[in-house]
Amino acid sequence: MGTTPTIVKSRRSTSVHWMRWLVVVLLLLTAGWFAWVYRQIVATSNIDNAQPADAIAVFGAAEYAGRPSPVLHARLDKVVSLYDEGMAPVVVTLGGGSDKDSGKTEAGVGRDYLLANGVPFDRIIAETKSLDTEEQVNSLANIEERKNFHHIIVVSDGTHLFRIALLCKRAGLNVYTSPRAPLGRIDDIDAAERMMHEMLSYTALRMDLRASGIRLWLEGRSSKS
């Protein structure tokens, strides 16, 4: 006995009904996830957890012809302040991205800036090979093991620190996050883009996305701060 058109139509209607509910549930879960990530990023960016440690590590940002960009400048000023307060005896500058005109690296420019602002040469470790946040964390973990550090203050943009904290935890690092000072009024579109970048980057990290194109974009190798 064949299936009647009415029964077939009923089954299709039921399938469509459940598909719609599935889509709604997935959208709600996705919205909930990104709302949680957003809140965590904001919370981390608004709290300075700096306390006495073995070292201060500053994550790299763009440099122009051997001079720190405004973002890197602000990060380095934060490091100088922490060092002058006696928070740690050693500073680690991270970042191997180099300027093709000057040949300088982010870490090298950071070291030069710190030297010019009173941090002794023998108190600075410049890591000049890493190209993205994850590589910088891995390099920092190697330095931590080699130097027998136990606690490290990590300095970067406030919105960057939530992801850094997760990467450091995975690398076995005990860190205190410390955001740089704001640069002033940021364009709403630029601020939204930065937040979206970090939300997607954190999500990709939690999902262990390793597709090269996605990873390069999310890690910001193709653009400078």
Predicted region positions:
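N-terminal type II signal-anchor transmembrane helix
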Residues: 5-47
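Serine/threonine-rich low-complexity intrinsically disordered regions
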Residues: 13-19, 51, 120, 206, ...
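A transmembrane-helix-recognition feature enriched in membrane-embedded lipid enzymes
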Residues: 188-218
